Design a protein with these regions (language model features):
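N-terminal accessory targeting/assembly segments
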Residues: 1-54
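Conserved short-loop catalytic and cofactor-binding motifs
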Residues: 5, 9, 63, 88
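Switch I (effector-binding) loop of TRAFAC-class P-loop GTPase G-domains
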Residues: 13-18, 40, 119-122, 146-158
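Short catalytic-loop micro-motif centered on adjacent basic/acidic residues
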Residues: 32-35, 87-88, 151-154
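A secondary-structure boundary/capping signal
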Residues: 35, 44, 62-63, 131
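Canonical P-loop GTPase G-domain recognition
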Residues: 58, 64-132, 145, 150
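Conserved lysine of the Walker
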Residues: 137
Length: 158
């Protein structure tokens, strides 16, 4: 037992996902971070902020129907104090998603105006949906695709 193997604290799949996010950031206009409204601290990726840098971001507090409404409101206020828009949503029913596009357009209003000045009126907004496993990324994407099935293959879930 003279050989001791070290335990890698940062698994390969996490490093791969980090690289995929970093390389795809230049292709998107905004990052939508999906977190579980019941456990907002533990359902966040602590390195996400350093990965996305200054890219515009919105936080979506999913499963808000199962969370304490008062605590969820406190979290929305917390994010507001940190200059981040947060919306309580429920991907299964669609509750709260009617606020998503108006909020995104507001966050990107200067960028949208710049596109329009360049003649790119109606340019699609490209969004990267990120979050730890089981927060509802696929459910959100499917809901936004009008109930279509985006499938797990379109989502990197690590």
């Amino acid at each position: 037992m003279s050989e001791v193997q070290s335990v890698q604290w940062f698994p390969g799949h996490m490093a791969k996902t980090r690289r995929a996010i970093q390389s795809s950031l230049k292709l998107v206009d905004l990052v939508a971070e999906l977190i579980d409204a019941r456990i907002p601290v533990s359902s966040r990726n602590p390195v996400l902020k350093s990965i996305i840098g200054n890219k515009p971001k919105i936080v979506l507090l999913n499963k808000s129907d199962m969370a304490d409404p008062a605590r969820t409101a406190e979290w929305v206020d917390y994010f507001k104090q940190h200059k981040t828009v947060a919306i309580p949503i429920d991907c299964k029913t669609g509750k709260g998603l009617n606020r998503l596009l108006p909020e995104i357009k507001n966050i990107l209003r200067e960028q949208i105006a710049a596109w329009e000045r360049k003649g790119m009126v109606g340019r699609p907004i490209r969004i990267m949906v990120v979050g730890v496993p089981n927060v509802g990324k696929s459910s959100l994407i499917n809901r936004l695709c009008k109930g279509g099935n985006a499938g797990k293959a379109a989502v990197q879930d690590k």
